[in-house]
A protein has these predicted regions:
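Active-site microenvironment of metallo-dependent hydrolases
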Residues: 1-23, 27-33, 38, 82-83, ...
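Structural motif
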Residues: 4-5, 46-47, 87-89, 117-120, ...
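Metal-associated gating/positioning segment near the N- to mid-region
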Residues: 38, 42-43, 48-114, 468
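Active-site neighborhood of phospho(di)ester-bond hydrolases with catalytic His/Asp-centered motifs
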Residues: 57-64, 91-94, 122, 157, ...
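Divalent-metal coordination cores built from histidine and acidic residues
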Residues: 78-188, 492-497
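Short, ordered loop/turn segments at secondary-structure junctions
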Residues: 93-96, 124-125, 161, 194-195, ...
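Short acidic, glycine/serine/threonine-rich loops at helix termini
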Residues: 100-104, 130-136, 167-171, 200-204, ...
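Histidine/acidic residue-rich metal-binding segments in metalloenzymes
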Residues: 138-157, 164-257, 268-282, 289
């Protein structure tokens, strides 16, 4: 019997027993044909790979991530995935959808077609994430119907505005969920439900949302699994308590590991989903259980029954490892073809621009002046009690503090205060909205930074301690049609150009990685103390992440789902 390939003398991971079994693997037409002890006596392989006792595990599968968080194109992202053993992903392009609507989703899918890694897409469900921001595009019910006609769609992406879902039966997202339940009753619906417990948690499950990838605690996981919810565990949730819970309880079918957002420098220097797998093992989880949570359970969650296991009829995506402790990848195979080998050079083949011309002209803002960073108050007012965003290290959550800020000649004297200014400017040419706030905590203490990479609306966000630096940073980003720029004493310290929709670079991974690291170092030199400064910066405009954020509509009290004024009454 002729086979395309026989991999002999290997320890094969059996997903159904969650253990390794010594044997051989025959592959035909990109699929596993036989796993067992037979070899040359039964098969006539075109190629023979001597496994030399190595470990064969399925290609890793990441079912919750956003390519745009890495600031690179799908082709560059795929290049990074393969060398880290990730052969299948489910990206949710709500960042590009916020900029361009359905065309953003379609172009991301199109750009993924020739990638080595398989990409099955989630339809962005919450674009915009709330009604309290202006975006370049939106995803409506008609758009969902249109996208459902493509074979690349596998689920409805994370329902982010959970507060509206459980409090407002007539909100847009509830209409989308009702439409999905009626027209596509078998479609998987992904969730984003931080801190929900008890009745509120079960309300969101009743709405059809049955997974959560946000920060997990033991209490939260226990409640979710008990209610039938699937848990997608990011690295930030991998505490000792969480890993111990997963080790000690029979919940293997109810969780998997996901990356969600990976910055380019981390992707380049640390890795991807393989990082979480190795970390779980280092924290005491058995290699078999960790592999299972990165292969079989994510495949089952997304009903990708053709992969996630090494068994007859399954897609022949697999890795060869020399040991299970370090999880060092020696070879990666995609549909039975060798696509990466650690002993050989691995160079990305760059392509010409992949997106329509208007994707490179998305920042529709005139250059700013210092006056754009003024906060006007009544001339008779000598000071005002103000809300202040407090940035907390180690979290994208913020808190709200209050202080009295002096005023002079009808302007709030924020430059003389101990606080920075945070301002956002609508950049799609729709309404000219702008909003100002004050900021403190583990954020930059001098200079300025401006960015169009600002979740999820991706308007121009500027933070600084003086108007001149803020103006220079903002205008540099406007001139480059998007990016992140850091300025101090009138000089540009670092810049990441992001010309595709103001959020993506077409440079190769190693170049963008160096740019991200340089910008990170620059921001830290100005006092930004967060462990992931770019992620912290970009989520200050995310109105579904507690507690006080800012959009072009104003300051947002996330927990109450409403805008609140910067200046407060003395009685407040």
């Amino acid at each position: 019997m002729r086979m395309d390939m026989l991999v002999r003398d290997i320890n094969v991971f059996n997903s159904y027993f969650k253990r390794f079994i010594k044997g051989n693997a025959a592959i035909k037409d990109g699929k596993f044909y036989y796993i067992g002890e037979r070899e040359l006596d039964a098969f006539e392989p075109d190629r023979i790979v001597d496994g030399q006792g190595k470990y064969m595990v399925p290609g890793l599968i990441d079912i919750h991530l956003h390519i745009e968080s890495t600031m690179v194109t799908p082709a560059t992202f795929s290049y990074g995935l393969i060398k880290n053993g990730v052969t299948t992903i489910v990206p949710e392009p709500h960042e590009m959808a916020n900029v361009f609507g359905i065309s953003g989703v379609k172009e991301m899918i199109k750009a993924s077609q020739d990638c080595v890694a398989d990409m099955f897409y989630a339809i962005p469900s919450s674009v915009p994430a709330t009604s309290m921001e202006t975006t370049g595009g939106s995803i409506e019910i008609d758009d969902i119907d249109e996208l459902m006609q493509t074979e690349d769609i596998i689920c409805l992406g994370e329902i982010m505005n959970y507060y509206e879902v459980i409090t407002d039966p007539d909100c847009k997202t509830n209409k989308i969920l009702s439409h999905i339940r009626s027209r596509y009753p078998n479609l998987i619906i992904e969730g984003h439900v931080p801190k929900l417990l008890d009745l509120d948690l079960q309300k969101i499950i009743n709405a059809g949302v049955n997974s959560d990838h946000t920060h997990q605690t033991v209490e939260g996981m226990d409640a979710r699994i008990a209610a039938g919810m699937f848990i997608e565990i990011q690295e930030k949730s991998m505490t000792e308590e969480v890993i111990d819970y997963l080790k000690e309880n029979q919940v293997d079918e109810h969780f998997c590991f996901v990356t969600d957002d990976v910055m380019t420098d981390s992707f380049q220097n640390r890795g991807h989903l393989n990082v979480l797998l190795k970390k779980a093992v280092q924290m005491g989880m058995t290699p078999e259980k960790a592999i299972y949570a990165c292969t079989y359970t994510p495949a089952q969650r997304m009903r990708m029954h053709d992969r996630g296991a090494i068994a007859p009829g399954k897609t022949a995506d697999f890795l060869l490892l020399s040991d299970l402790e370090t999880f060092e990848i020696e070879q990666v195979y995609k549909k039975g073809e060798l696509v990466y080998e650690s002993a050989r050079p691995y160079v990305q083949e760059m392509k010409e621009e992949q997106f329509p011309e208007h994707f490179y002209q998305s920042v529709k803002l005139a250059e700013l002046t210092e006056n754009d960073f003024n906060i006007t108050i009544p001339e008779s007012l000598e000071s005002s009690k103000c809300r202040i965003i407090n940035v907390q290290n180690g979290s994208t959550f913020t808190s709200e503090t209050h202080d009295r800020i002096e005023g002079k000649e009808g302007q709030l004297s924020w430059e003389e205060s101990p606080y920075g200014l945070i301002a956002t400017f609508e950049r799609y040419g729709k309404n000219g909205n702008r909003a100002h706030g004050l900021i403190t905590g583990d954020v930059l203490k001098r200079g300025a930074v401006a960015t169009t990479y600002s979740h999820d609306n991706h308007n121009l966000l500027v933070i600084g301690h003086n108007k001149q630096d803020m103006m220079i940073a903002a205008n540099e980003v406007i001139r480059k049609q998007g990016g992140v720029c850091c300025v101090h004493d009138g000089k540009v310290l670092s810049m990441i150009p992001l010309p595709v929709g103001g959020i993506l670079s077409e440079e190769p991974m190693d170049i963008v990685s160096k740019q991200v690291q340089h910008l990170t170092d620059a921001l830290k030199s100005l006092g930004y103390e967060h462990y992931n400064v770019i992620m912290s910066l970009s989520t200050l405009s995310l109105p579904v992440s507690p507690a006080l954020k800012i959009t072009d509509h104003g300051l947002i009290n996330v927990n109450e789902g409403k805008t609140v004024p910067l200046m407060m009454s003395d009685e407040a």
